[in-house]
Swiss-Prot record:
Keyword field contains Transmembrane: yes
Catalytically driven reaction(s): fluoride(in) = fluoride(out)
Protein family (similarity comment): Belongs to the fluoride channel Fluc/FEX (TC 1.A.43) family.
Pfam family of the protein (one): CRCB
Gene Ontology cellular-component annotations: plasma membrane
Binding site for Na(+): G73, S76
Membrane topology classification: Multi-pass membrane protein
Entry protein name: Fluoride-specific ion channel FluC
Membrane spanning residue stretches: 9-29, 35-55, 63-83, 94-114
Subcellular location: Cell inner membrane
Coiled-coil intervals, chain numbering: none
A GO MF term: metal ion binding
Chain's role: Fluoride-specific ion channel. Important for reducing fluoride concentration in the cell, thus reducing its toxicity.
Length: 126
């Protein structure tokens, strides 16, 4: 029970930090469109999540929960991504919306793969 409580607290703390950072970054990037800011933040979270996955066996479970589930989960947001795609589609049409969706998913996957590769590369050098 203590292990689960510690994991829950780690997720809570990481989520709080990630969510606040996301909000701060949103305010710091006022010149960017809403879709561009969300895109950048989500891609950064995908990269970090891939890196954490690669080094997960070296991390205490609470630290992994804090970083992966909490921080990355709080930093990135699927709901904002979908809402912004909906708004983009309504303003600019389905082809633009589908293109943006495809690009963000592909970039997120590429970022996660790159983060994991860099994490594994670091592990190999140890």
């Amino acid at each position: 029970m203590r292990q689960k409580a510690g994991s829950y607290l780690a997720v809570f703390a990481g989520g709080a930090i990630g969510s606040v950072l996301r909000e701060l970054l949103g305010f710091q990037l006022p010149g960017l469109s809403f879709l561009t800011a969300t895109f950048g933040i989500n891609i950064a979270a995908c990269f970090l999540l891939g890196w954490l996955y690669a080094i997960r066996h070296r991390l205490h479970p609470h630290l992994l929960h804090l970083g992966a589930v909490g921080f990355c989960g709080g930093l990135s947001t699927f709901s904002s991504f979908v809402l912004e795609l909906d708004q983009l589609t309504r303003m600019d049409g389905w082809s633009i919306g589908l293109t943006a969706m495809t690009l963000e998913i592909a970039a997120g996957l590429a970022a996660a793969i790159l983060g994991e590769a860099l994490g594994r590369g670091r592990e190999a050098r140890r």
